[in-house]
């Protein structure tokens, strides 16, 4: 019996995860149809993707670029319908336009569309970690009510998902997320004070966008992933461990109460996790070769240095505080990373700004989206205001 074609929406289509998803989808035209493509501001790149993949719908987040998108589609003779803005995207992902959503919009900007997909009961391939960090309780509740199928696309959570063959943690003693350690593993604080944005974006094993690359360099990426794992798998902080594994071949480990430990290994390529999410519980080709253990003949593990890289500690603290603290952490980090990439602050000022926000703002119960968005806005305001009180980056 032939299975129906799955209609897939790729949100964040012009980013690195979007490109990986489209690569996998293009390999299986009889199984998948790209029904919707969405991007934030890169309208020319979105138009090029529309020309290649011929989606039914295209959405540009920046409403001022709607005319450019619409006219570009018309000039190319494409039948793709143009839309703009957050509300239009949320409405489309909740409609019959798609049954599968790749949520890869970076930052809090992806929250509304991710929640809309969860409420509508879609298969949600979740690469937008901020949705879980900012509103994890709400997202998981909506998915539970609607029957949405959440499959994490982060390599670490996808590895746990594969080891468990689901998100059920019966019999699990603990899970261990691995971290590459970023480009500055082994650096001390004196060395980190001189780091430039260009250096921070040079990740040793993964190809990622600027914001995620900096998060990896500060270990905030791993901190956010600890919070994600808490929501995805329902485990407390003490059952979520982190180890630095510079080869980035073992993506996570699951230790069971009987003494067994399962690990998932693969080359560091997001196409593997995307293929898992698109086809689960079956398997499809991703374009990623298998792992040659004779070529990679050693696997190293070490504890993360949370004194030097304090973002991981701050993330754990925020998770244990609960309520709106993770939302504060996330918003302050976004502002701090943006300022660092603009050369306005030094590398070590990123955790300092985050800690300032966490100690300044009160904790509330994270029981409504309105509360979370209000806290998000207020955190951004006070973090912006605090930028002038922190030292500028050191001259090279």
UniProtKB/Swiss-Prot annotation:
EC number of this enzyme: 1.1.1.267
Keyword Metal-binding attributed: yes
Top-level EC class: oxidoreductase
Binding residues for NADPH: 14-17, 40, 128, 130, 209
SUPFAM superfamilies noted in UniProt: 1-deoxy-D-xylulose-5-phosphate reductoisomerase, C-terminal domain, Glyceraldehyde-3-phosphate dehydrogenase-like, C-terminal domain, NAD(P)-binding Rossmann-fold domains
Annotated metabolic or biological route of this protein: Isoprenoid biosynthesis; isopentenyl diphosphate biosynthesis via DXP pathway; isopentenyl diphosphate from 1-deoxy-D-xylulose 5-phosphate: step 1/6
UniProt: Mn(2+) binding residues: 154, 156, 225
Residues at which 1-deoxy-D-xylulose 5-phosphate binds: 129, 155-156, 180, 203, 216, 221-222, 225
Catalytic activity: 2-C-methyl-D-erythritol 4-phosphate + NADP(+) = 1-deoxy-D-xylulose 5-phosphate + NADPH + H(+)
Gene Ontology MF terms in the entry: 1-deoxy-D-xylulose-5-phosphate reductoisomerase activity; manganese ion binding; NADPH binding
A matching Pfam family: DXPR_C
Cofactor: Mg(2+); Mn(2+)
Key words, A-Z: Isoprene biosynthesis, Manganese, Metal-binding, NADP, Oxidoreductase
GO annotation, biological process: isopentenyl diphosphate biosynthetic process, methylerythritol 4-phosphate pathway involved in terpenoid biosynthetic process
InterPro entries listed in its UniProt record: DXP_reductoisomerase (IPR003821), DXP_reductoisomerase_C (IPR013644), DXP_reductoisomerase_N (IPR013512), DXPR_C (IPR026877), DXPR_C_sf (IPR036169), NAD(P)-bd_dom_sf (IPR036291)
Record bears the keyword Mitochondrion: no
Family: Belongs to the DXR family.
Its biological purpose: Catalyzes the NADPH-dependent rearrangement and reduction of 1-deoxy-D-xylulose-5-phosphate (DXP) to 2-C-methyl-D-erythritol 4-phosphate (MEP).
Protein name (database record): 1-deoxy-D-xylulose 5-phosphate reductoisomerase
């Amino acid at each position: 019996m032939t299975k129906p074609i799955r209609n897939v929406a790729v949100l964040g289509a012009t980013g690195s995860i979007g490109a990986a998803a489209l690569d996998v989808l293009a390999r299986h035209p009889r199984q998948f149809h790209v029904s919707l493509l969405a991007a934030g501001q890169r309208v020319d790149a979105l138009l090029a993707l529309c020309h290649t993949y011929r989606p039914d719908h295209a959405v540009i987040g920046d409403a001022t670029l709607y005319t450019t998108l619409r006219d570009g589609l018309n000039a190319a003779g494409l039948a793709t319908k143009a839309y703009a803005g957050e509300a239009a995207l949320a409405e489309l992902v909740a409609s019959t336009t798609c049954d599968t959503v790749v949520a890869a919009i970076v930052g809090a900007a992806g929250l509304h569309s991710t929640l809309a997909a969860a409420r509508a009961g879609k298969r949600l391939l979740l690469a937008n970690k901020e949705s879980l960090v900012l509103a994890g309780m709400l997202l998981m509740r909506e998915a539970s009510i609607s029957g949405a199928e959440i499959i994490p696309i982060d390599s670490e959570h996808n590895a746990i998902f594969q080891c468990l063959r689901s998100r059920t943690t019966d019999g699990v003693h603990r899970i261990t997320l691995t971290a590459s350690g970023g480009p500055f593993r082994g650096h001390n604080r004196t060395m980190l004070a001189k780091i430039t944005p260009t250096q921070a974006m040079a990740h040793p094993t993964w190809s990622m966008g600027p914001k995620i690359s900096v998060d990896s360099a500060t270990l905030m990426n791993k901190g956010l992933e600890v919070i994600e794992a808490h929501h995805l798998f329902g485990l407390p902080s003490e059952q979520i461990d982190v180890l630095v594994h510079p080869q980035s071949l073992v993506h996570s480990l699951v230790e069971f109460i009987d003494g067994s430990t399962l690990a998932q290994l693969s080359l560091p390529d997001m196409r593997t996790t995307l293929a898992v999410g698109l086809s689960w519980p079956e398997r499809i080709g991703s374009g990623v070769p298998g792992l040659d253990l004779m070529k990679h003949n050693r696997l190293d593990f070490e504890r993360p240095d949370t004194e030097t890289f304090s973002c991981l500690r701050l993330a754990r603290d925020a998770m244990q505080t609960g309520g709106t603290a993770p939302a504060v952490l996330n918003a302050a980090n976004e502002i701090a990373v943006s300022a660092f990439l603009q050369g306005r602050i030094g590398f070590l000022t990123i955790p300092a700004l985050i800690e300032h926000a966490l100690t300044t703002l009160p904790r509330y119960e994270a029981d409504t989206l309105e509360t979370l968005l209000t806290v998000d806005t207020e955190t951004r305001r006070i973090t912006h205001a605090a930028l002038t009180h922190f030292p500028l980056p050191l001259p090279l």
